[in-house]
Amino acid sequence: MINPDAITLVFLPGLTADHRLFDKQVEFFGGKYNIAVWDAPAHAASWPFQFNFDLFDKARWLYEILEREKIVKPVIVGQSMGGYVGQAFAQLYPEQLKGFVSIDSAPLQRKYVTAAELWLLKRMEPVYAHYPWKLLLKSGTDGVAVSDYGRNLMREMMLVYDGNQKRYAQIAGHGFRILAEAMEKDLPYEIQCPALLICGTQDHAGSCIRYNKAWHRDTQIPLHWIEGAGHNSNTDKPERINALIGEFISNIK
């Protein structure tokens, strides 16, 4: 039951992950705030789904979900791709957001990425389609988390696609492609609500550390480094992340 007077934490998992990514946050904040977690299109429970949408479609659908659920005070907490969806949402509906928390994500502005990075982002599907699945499973788990809990959880989420590597490759390839296309739009992607940047010191996914340094430098949005955490820092250091989110929300009117 949604309390319309309370803040709603809207958790958006990263690419190929699902609602379980935020289990430790749901457990901690449940009962304190309204909670919404979204399996993005083509992910987990949101399957089957056609791959004919872009990042702004995802933002629009999220808006429709919030409308339907009568969520009027959303604070988006987006991990990786979820953070990009949050920025697209902020671009389309700047007055709707009460707060934005980026966890191991990066800015959507075109100026932060090179032409070579955009070129690669659009051509990742064949890589994921032809990479040996067992190696992909290992790199996909060890590469995003440092803790046993974080790695085991990511492995469980990846095993949803066990036996259907084509679907996994489609989800990943399409996700990176629509990310590149959103960057190429060269829109302001300005966050006008209270915001917080969080990044693990062991985040080796892409260039997240470099991007977050530049994002903080250019916008002065507070940036918190999570010592010893990987790309899924909310699974590596959940207590620290929960404390930061809790402190952030307490300052939102």
PLM region spans:
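Active-site signature of alpha/beta-hydrolase-fold catalytic machinery across serine-
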Residues: 24, 88-92
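Active-site loop/oxyanion-hole signature of alpha/beta-hydrolase fold enzymes
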Residues: 36-77, 243
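Gly/Ala-rich beta-loop-alpha elbow adjacent to hydrolase catalytic centers
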Residues: 78-82, 86
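Flexible "cap/lid" loop of the alpha/beta hydrolase fold
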Residues: 91, 98-130
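Conserved alpha/beta-hydrolase catalytic His-Asp/Glu region
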Residues: 111-113, 130-190
